[in-house]
A protein has these predicted regions:
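Flavin-dependent oxidoreductase catalytic cores
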Residues: 1-172
Length: 172
């Protein structure tokens, strides 16, 4: 059997295949299921300071013959409720990376401290979601804003921090 373990951003992963942040990472059971199916690590659904219902259905549409488009609107239960889902995944043995989103560097730093306290091994900063006003691309749309967020978060926590940035900017 081939050895696929890797170390990325200071995090040991049993292989380089991760469950990306998204709807499948909303519950502890689905995170644990991805781990049990062989994922090298799992990234949670992006979590904010307060619950968000997201957009009403349909949130996924077929696009001509070649693909699907989705716009969820960052639905999540909020940081007060989500730690129990992380605990379920961690009890299953999963390597969990916590994804967070916020509207400004200070809120990102506060959320980072709360998410780090759950025992996640690293943080993903969602600076790329184009679907929710005041978050994602609106916060991370310029290199200067990304730098402010990353600096605030790395001052607040000691675990690795990964900025998920948008490709949708003219200032790349």
């Amino acid at each position: 059997v081939a050895e696929l373990a890797v170390r990325c951003a200071g995090v040991n992963l049993r292989n380089p295949f991760l469950l990306a942040s998204g709807v499948w990472g909303e519950s502890g059971e689905s995170l644990a299921g991805a781990w049990s199916a062989g994922a090298g690590g799992v990234i949670t659904k992006s979590i904010g300071s307060v619950p968000r219902p997201g957009y009403p259905n349909p949130t996924i549409e077929a696009y001509e013959r070649w693909g699907l488009l989705n716009a969820m609107g960052l639905p999540n239960p909020g940081i007060d409720e989500y730690p129990r889902e992380i605990e379920i995944a961690r009890r299953a043995g999963a390597t969990v990376i916590g994804s967070i989103f916020a509207g400004d560097p200070e809120e990102f730093a506060r959320l980072a401290v709360r998410m780090a306290a759950t025992g996640v091994v690293a943080l993903e900063l969602n600076l790329s979601c184009p679907h929710a006003e005041g978050f994602g691309t609106e916060v991370g749309g310029t290199p200067e804003n990304v730098e402010k967020v990353v600096r605030a978060v790395t001052k607040a926590v000691t675990i690795p921090v990964i900025a998920k940035i948008t490709p949708n900017t003219g200032d790349a």
